From Swiss-Prot:
Residues of the Protein kinase domain: 191-453
Molecular-function annotations in GO: alpha-2A adrenergic receptor binding; ATP binding; beta-adrenergic receptor kinase activity; Edg-2 lysophosphatidic acid receptor binding; G protein-coupled receptor binding; G protein-coupled receptor kinase activity; protein kinase activity
Residues the entry annotates as binding ATP: I197, G198, R199, G200, G201, F202, G203, E204, V205, K220
The protein's name: Beta-adrenergic receptor kinase 1
Catalytic activity: [beta-adrenergic receptor] + ATP = [beta-adrenergic receptor]-phosphate + ADP + H(+)
GO cellular component: cilium; cytoplasm; cytoplasmic side of mitochondrial outer membrane; cytosol; membrane; plasma membrane; postsynapse; presynapse
Activation/inhibition comment: In contrast to other AGC family kinases, the catalytic activity is solely regulated by the binding of substrates and ligands, not by phosphorylation of the kinase domain.
Tissue specificity field: Expressed in peripheral blood leukocytes.
Bilayer-spanning residue ranges: none
UniProt-annotated stretches for the region N-terminal: 1-190
Enzyme Commission code: 2.7.11.15
Task performed by this protein: Specifically phosphorylates the agonist-occupied form of the beta-adrenergic and closely related receptors, probably inducing a desensitization of them. Key regulator of LPAR1 signaling. Competes with RALA for binding to LPAR1 thus affecting the signaling properties of the receptor. Desensitizes LPAR1 and LPAR2 in a phosphorylation-independent manner. Positively regulates ciliary smoothened (SMO)-dependent Hedgehog (Hh) signaling pathway by facilitating the trafficking of SMO into the cilium and the stimulation of SMO activity.
Source organism: Homo sapiens
GO biological-process terms attached to the record: cardiac muscle contraction; desensitization of G protein-coupled receptor signaling pathway; G protein-coupled acetylcholine receptor signaling pathway; G protein-coupled receptor signaling pathway; heart development; negative regulation of relaxation of smooth muscle; negative regulation of striated muscle contraction; negative regulation of the force of heart contraction by chemical signal
Amino acid sequence: MADLEAVLADVSYLMAMEKSKATPAARASKKILLPEPSIRSVMQKYLEDRGEVTFEKIFSQKLGYLLFRDFCLNHLEEARPLVEFYEEIKKYEKLETEEERVARSREIFDSYIMKELLACSHPFSKSATEHVQGHLGKKQVPPDLFQPYIEEICQNLRGDVFQKFIESDKFTRFCQWKNVELNIHLTMNDFSVHRIIGRGGFGEVYGCRKADTGKMYAMKCLDKKRIKMKQGETLALNERIMLSLVSTGDCPFIVCMSYAFHTPDKLSFILDLMNGGDLHYHLSQHGVFSEADMRFYAAEIILGLEHMHNRFVVYRDLKPANILLDEHGHVRISDLGLACDFSKKKPHASVGTHGYMAPEVLQKGVAYDSSADWFSLGCMLFKLLRGHSPFRQHKTKDKHEIDRMTLTMAVELPDSFSPELRSLLEGLLQRDVNRRLGCLGRGAQEVKESPFFRSLDWQMVFLQKYPPPLIPPRGEVNAADAFDIGSFDEEDTKGIKLLDSDQELYRNFPLTISERWQQEVAETVFDTINAETDRLEARKKAKNKQLGHEEDYALGKDCIMHGYMSKMGNPFLTQWQRRYFYLFPNRLEWRGEGEAPQSLLTMEEIQSVEETQIKERKCLLLKIRGGKQFILQCDSDPELVQWKKELRDAYREAQQLVQRVPKMKNKPRSPVVELSKVPLVQRGSANGL
């Protein structure tokens, strides 16, 4: 029966994988719902306050670029040639061979440069043209040939074109997507969890599918009780920090994190899913690798280490078991549990795996940095070629003996190794850090320039264009059987109680890596959801054509901000009422079904603007004169933050104005401001957009 369950688990997992690759959006069991377009008023202010409404910030984001591109290609004739030129250059930069670049560079030059020069309408500098002409004249076609044009295209898009984008519906859509992104609160219900694929000291790793996009991931679940029992809180939190540091920027050679969240019992990391097993497993199945095969793995691992080291992260646990293969055979460095940030202080702890640890790591009290990883790389490459670490002779398992040999033994390299390989390994396995390859001041570049890698084009390595020496079998789960992986004994943690103080440690644990979420959405449901939302909004516009839109009331007035909130201000009502609110310098108005035409609170009536919590939801509490209160609930975190800020600012400015104006004797002040009266102070733009 157990065997049947294992087979069914494997079949279910493999089917989910195949469907996710083919049509991930069709596998989405939840739907992302974009907020109303009116969210723009709040989100634009929220993003502006954080310096996010700039050309550079929006153009560099995946969804921002896609919406900006759509606007330029379909709604702004003068910008279309610039964006088309930009996209052709980006395609050129990814070409694999020089022959392809020669042909494509000439096509780009003829279509986008020479054609415009002949028409006397070339909007670029003479120096950019001469740069490209000079290289083409010498038949030089580097990947960055058109870089001067990239800079000038962006400069041309940065001004009026970008401003028109900000004023368009496409920027409104960007605000809608950013609101969704900034309000992500993941739980286990957001994933379909499949079979177990691994186990570690604190928990298990499962294959899983994200419900709203259909994308497959690995879910690493750490048990909070087991962490507490082993006093591993610092390690668990450190892994989250290290993953957040390395998971930004384009690096296909590290198992990166897209999300982190926690439940009352578990910490969960959502990671890249690697289906091809690890190099330790394949070394045992395949036998030792040839120099050529090892060169492939070494090159991709070097780029992974370079990505970490550029972010001041030392990995400290490089070994074949931590190098995972994807379904195509390319590799990624996994498990950053022992990684360390050395940007402010160098580590000196002796951590890692015996047989791969650098001498400076083994020596107590000695500080080190990325140097440790280059020594470990030498040990690992030796193992791929010989089947054992250079310091683990005769399969000894005595850790002290292995460490002693690491500190004292001169490594003897077999005569069968090529001179280039010997040079590489001798450089990496130098006990003296000051003489070690990769530690002489230029980091990974020194290793990449080794004669052993002379035949490689590092751009092609980065683009994963070289064929892997080993392709994992398709249609198989390249992981141990679920029953062989086993499970933890629940009795171990039976007496462990999680206190509020334990949970407080993980208060800031949840995280969404923005660029990885945007990439996931772009690859799966972006077009579908945009099309569906366009249809819904078009129907709503047609329906409301005669009635008018809520936003229209703010037009031409000194409205600071407007949008939907839910209120609970009547002492006899316990239900939330969704209304459309308008914040002016001297009052807060709202409209909705069943409301009086002049529903408002003046700033004179408000005594304070505070944050409170009702049924675990953060809310705004407006304390009103006479002991009354007015409670507001927002649909998302950014809205709550921005409404609180703007309400407090308006209240503070109104108070300051009252203090500056001399009090008029014997003239009572009305607590209600008529809508027709001139506002006290003008803050913000005319319509808050």
